[in-house]
């Protein structure tokens, strides 16, 4: 059995509300702040292999509306990674039932954009029911990718 290796998470320096990963058990991972060309989170040594972008519900609606070209460019850049994901700090039902109050975007249009671009650019979209859940999912994705990449555990 191979010894479990610990990894270091990179948080992009532009990330305004970074995850701390302090509630991860049994031990929080090491985290550093470093500029990433794409995404908000990656793993030291695997920056060109895996990327994760975090979006709050209001970020998502803003990006799908006025920031549409920038959002599609982000999907295009993410397509170059072995694994790329967008984590939404909200449930799928919230996209439809509780869209941001000031948004003029049709929730169906936002949802269809996510589906269309996730397929076109091979980017996973993970709606999570809360910010805490999204932080946990972010950790689990990075941890699983790291372990699979280095063949550390089955």
Show the residue positions of the predicted features.
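Non-catalytic C-terminal interaction segments of nucleic acid-processing enzymes
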Residues: 1-47, 59-154
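Conserved catalytic cores of phosphodiester-cleaving nucleases, focusing on short active-site segments
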Residues: 50-56
């Amino acid at each position: 059995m191979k010894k479990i290796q610990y990894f270091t998470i990179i948080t992009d320096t532009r990330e305004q509300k970074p995850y701390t990963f302090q509630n991860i058990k049994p031990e929080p991972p090491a985290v550093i702040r470093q500029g990433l060309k794409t995404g908000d989170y990656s793993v030291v040594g695997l920056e060109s292999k895996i990327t994760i972008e975090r979006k709050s519900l209001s970020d998502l609606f803003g990006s799908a509306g006025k920031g549409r070209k920038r959002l599609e460019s982000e999907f295009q850049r993410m397509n170059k990674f072995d694994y790329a994901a967008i984590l939404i700090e909200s449930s799928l039902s919230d996209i439809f039932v509780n869209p941001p109050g000031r948004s003029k975007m049709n929730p169906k249009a936002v949802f269809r954009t996510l589906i269309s671009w996730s397929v076109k650019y091979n980017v996973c979209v993970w709606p999570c029911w809360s910010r805490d859940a999204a932080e946990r999912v972010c950790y689990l994705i990075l941890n699983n990718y790291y372990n699979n990449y280095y063949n550390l555990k089955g």
